[in-house]
Amino acid sequence: MRSSLLLLVFFLSIGWARYCVHNEKSWCQGHNIWGWCFHNKSSGVFNCDDNAFCVSQEQLKNKKSSGCFLRDNSSICCCNDADGCNLGFIGVQPKYAHGQQCTNSMEVPNEDIRQFRPCDDPFCYSVLTAEDDGGPTTVTRGCHSRKMVMHHMSKNEDDKYQNNTKWRETKQIAEMPSCAEILKDQPKVNGTTSMCVDFTYDQEAEDGEEVDEPIKMKGRLCCCAGSNKCNEHAMWADEGISLTEMLEEIEARKVPVDSSAPVNIILSIAFSIFLIHF
């Protein structure tokens, strides 16, 4: 009886997940029952308690909680009370040590700009889209990590129950490199790091709509970090690179660079020749 009960608890628990913000991947997925979201206010790390700091704290065991510990002059924060809850630590003292406030708005052609409450995030973003051959631009601005957590929560729910299609609205940016990858190695200018990536795509038809040819679209994802509302003015004229160039750059980072290797090879060959002849 006991083993059957434990098995039931296991199968029920694997059906749920705790979604957290991740400073490199934008989002991560932990366990809903014993999973924690983590943030280190000194290092700027956000993750799903990858090093098991939170889960190892005796005072947190079997509790829903949110708070910070002082460890080695650093505030280390844990929460498991909501998806993406480690975003809430950005505004905890010291405020904005990592992360900033982002503009949160929607600009649709021929409509009034819709301004929403600013949000806190490790990365701010803007997405610009328009028909490839020209035309008015639609702009969405907001918090990138928060948006990616919401995207994957929605998609997971839709995959299971076919009742939530909100993820389709953010499918394009979810398939792009993360803001951490886009901004890596970019210089700071006046305290802000920023970069835009250009891409193209075919606009999908609405449900039930038939089209002869999909509409060719162009898009631009701009990421920034370092100053409040740094995403407020990102537009087509800003500096940017193509998605192809960005992906090539990301792949190049994975190749270890060892400038001593060619020298070592030459010395090895020379030494071999010396041994043969002498």
Curated annotation (Swiss-Prot):
Residues 272-278 are cytoplasmic. Glycans are attached at N40, N73, N163, N190. Residues 18-254 are extracellular. Coiled coil: none annotated. GO terms for cellular component: plasma membrane. The keyword Cell membrane applies. The chain crosses the membrane at residues 255-271. It is a single-pass type I membrane protein. It is found in: Cell membrane. Keywords: Cell membrane, Glycoprotein, Membrane, Signal, Transmembrane, Transmembrane helix. Residues 1-17 form the signal peptide. GO terms for biological process: positive regulation of detection of mechanical stimulus involved in sensory perception of touch. It comes from the Eukaryota. Plays a role in mechanosensory transduction (touch sensitivity). This is Protein mtd-1. The lineage of its organism: Eukaryota, Metazoa, Ecdysozoa, Nematoda, Chromadorea.
